[in-house]
Amino acid sequence: MRSHYNIDLGISHVGQSVKLCGWVNSYRDHGGVIFIDLRDRSGIIQLVCDPNDSKEAHEIASNARNEFVLIAEGTIRPRGEGLVNPKLKTGEIEVVVSKLTIENESIVPPFAIADESVNEELRLKYRFLDLRNPKLYENFALRSKACIAARNSLANMGFLEVETPILTKATPEGARDYLVPSRVHQGEFYALPQSPQLFKQLLMCSGFDRYFQIAKCFRDEDLRADRQPEFTQIDVEMSFCEKKDVINVAETFLKDIFKACGKEIQTPFRQMQYKDAMENYGSDKPDLRFDLKFIDVIDIFAKSNNEIFANIAKDTKKNRIKAIRVPKGDTIFSKRQMQRFEEFVRKFGAEGLAFIQVKEDGLKGPLCKFFSEEDLNELSKRCKLEVGDVVFFGAGAKKTVLDYMGRFRIFLANELNLIDPNALEFLWVVDFPMFEQNDDGSYSAMHHPFTMPKNIDENDLEEISSIAYDVVLNGVELGGGSIRIHKNDIQQKVFKLLNIDEEQQKEKFGFLLDALSFGAPPHGGIAIGLDRLIMLVTGANSIREVIAFPKTQRAQCLMTEAPSPASNEAMRELGIKLRENIK
């Protein structure tokens, strides 16, 4: 129906006849000549409807309004002197219309398509209108390129694309499952997969050797800016591999994805042990676009005559005292800002925020009186302090201190404008603990219980490490993976350490244990969150900007009004009766 997309046209097409299709983005009547900005998925081009060129087209144009669907035929000409629009990629040209057709009309839209001030709820209610915005379209054009690049890259490395089931069995993977009642087997439920984890391991047991899938996953969890109840991941598994092999494959397809999106990245990515990431940055996904690395000063504080700090410093296993040096911070931060910093860390469990300022005549601040001159000199040397600097200290329980100082590090970086929004800093975080302790004292798998432990015979669960790895970009976890357990006895031992008894093992994971008993190969893999990846590539503020029809933070679709009540007939067929007064 059309001869070109708008964006395909430029000054080299002057004199050509074209046929264009799209929507009225804006409409202006200038003394009898009507100008229409015609929008298609690629962008905007200006139509000129002059009665001297075509009375019929001019008359039809006079009836057009915003969001009407038009088909326009005409000739490309250059814009007049001083009329070039540098904001448009087609700003050097316009189309003199000889024939115009209104294919469909539109009622008055609830908002202007390009209006960025419209609240998100209204945009999501009318998502089909919101998606007409060329800026959003560009997000999905990049997403499409990324998916094609991932498929091509993995296929070139010998991976086979295989689809795994959506209706499956509930397995504990860290979040709540979405359950689907069975009509045929009343009282029983399918679960929507949180990941294809077990199925891809079974494919390795089947001898498929190299698998991938761009997979839909579902998790019933509380939502944040970077979470959705349904999301997409680039899922990869391979046999007869070590950690370095999986990392090499992941770096290869990530490099190809970024190249397809117009960005060059350098490989290999740097690597950092989990322990070092936590101790130096207070996060297992540190943002390395800026420094502000922690400095360990617990040994110096152990010599202070402040009872609180001295007691904290006695137990170096359970407690931490960390410093963050801000060069020239004393010349930058006002007294009010220093108060704001303390208010910030208190929100995350800090008792306060101690600091020392570096003046021309030495170190100053309430802390200084608790240290000898020798200890202050050692502190100054350890922190590499210079005149004008300020150094902040966090002290207390290990988990609390690392958490709030990690958050404070990012807060400071934003305050100081240290983050380059165009930088791409990749990092592998490796050697994660196998288990983590919950608030109730019990233990759970830090990644998942199918991860291969390094030292399974260690008596202290907190000392058992795993062959697990996460890939981080600019402080955001893009994805993670591990070498898997491929031996039945090791898998059963991990289950027992997690207090999953033999009966539960058979009920929940019997099929996996069976598969591991029939000569399962060594295998491992990784999953990359596609939505997060595209969010970072496009610079979108929210993951909802890169998902065509996203849910709200209350897991609702405002457009379709899902979820919604089921009919009484459907409930009867499923054998389900709801309790009254459900809230």
Curated annotation (Swiss-Prot):
GO terms for molecular function: aspartate-tRNA ligase activity; aspartate-tRNA(Asn) ligase activity; ATP binding; nucleic acid binding. Coiled coil: none annotated. One of its GO terms (biological process) is aspartyl-tRNA aminoacylation. GO terms for cellular component: cytoplasm. L-aspartate binds at E173, R219, H447, R484. ATP binds at R219, D220, E221, Q228, E477, G529, L530, D531, R532. Its EC number is 6.1.1.23. Residues 197-200 are annotated as: Aspartate. Signal peptide: none annotated. Keywords: Aminoacyl-tRNA synthetase, ATP-binding, Cytoplasm, Ligase, Nucleotide-binding, Protein biosynthesis. The keyword Cytoplasm applies. The record marks H30, G82 as: Important for tRNA non-discrimination. It is found in: Cytoplasm. It catalyses: tRNA(Asx) + L-aspartate + ATP = L-aspartyl-tRNA(Asx) + AMP + diphosphate. Aspartyl-tRNA synthetase with relaxed tRNA specificity since it is able to aspartylate not only its cognate tRNA(Asp) but also tRNA(Asn). Reaction proceeds in two steps: L-aspartate is first activated by ATP to form Asp-AMP and then transferred to the acceptor end of tRNA(Asp/Asn). Homodimer. Belongs to the class-II aminoacyl-tRNA synthetase family. Type 1 subfamily. This is Aspartate--tRNA(Asp/Asn) ligase. The lineage of its organism: Bacteria, Pseudomonadati, Campylobacterota, Epsilonproteobacteria, Campylobacterales.
